[in-house]
UniProtKB/Swiss-Prot annotation:
Provenance organism: Prunus dulcis (Almond)
Stretches the record annotates as Disordered: 1-28
Protein name: Seed allergenic protein 1
Alphabetical keyword list: Allergen, IgE-binding protein
An example molecular function term from Gene Ontology annotations: IgE binding
Length: 28
């Protein structure tokens, strides 16, 4: 479970972080 959760957490954060940063950067 730790492994799966860790990967999921890292993958989820990576996608959200990139989109988030890209969304405001493009709007600005």
């Amino acid at each position: 479970v730790t492994x799966e959760e860790g990967x999921y957490s890292i993958s989820d954060q990576s996608k959200v972080g990139e989109q988030x940063i890209r969304s405001p950067d493009r709007e600005m």
